[in-house]
Amino acid sequence: MIDHIAFWQAPKVLETLKLQALGKPVAMLLGHPSSRYQKKDLLFIDNWEPDSVTELKVVLLAPYATINLIRDFQIEKKIKPELPEIVEELMLCPNPRCITHSEEVPHKIRTKEGRLPFECYYCEFRYSHDQVKFL
């Protein structure tokens, strides 16, 4: 289960991570009351355990998300993915004038001390999680 997704962002997370391609049952809860965020979304994926790249993608799309591994209707493990300071070869810079769109250079994105906003390593274009596009 992916918990603490920003309100109305679960469809984007589901589509971007291609979770429906897993062939597992998926349930989406939109606008669930939250004491911390007022409203939040959740994704329930039956019998799912993400790899490290998927965990990183989750935190890039939903910075406050928690991944809960559920077995026999109990939370077995909570994973709070953290943003590294540099993300390489995973995300595209949204700036159309960035060198990464015309030259063969590695795609690199900086996070300031593991926080938002993201910043392109080359053009220093700053953007937030709602502008993330993966390679």
For the regions a protein language model found, what residue spans apply to each?
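Cys/His-clustered metal-coordination modules, chiefly Zn-binding fingers
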Residues: F73-L135
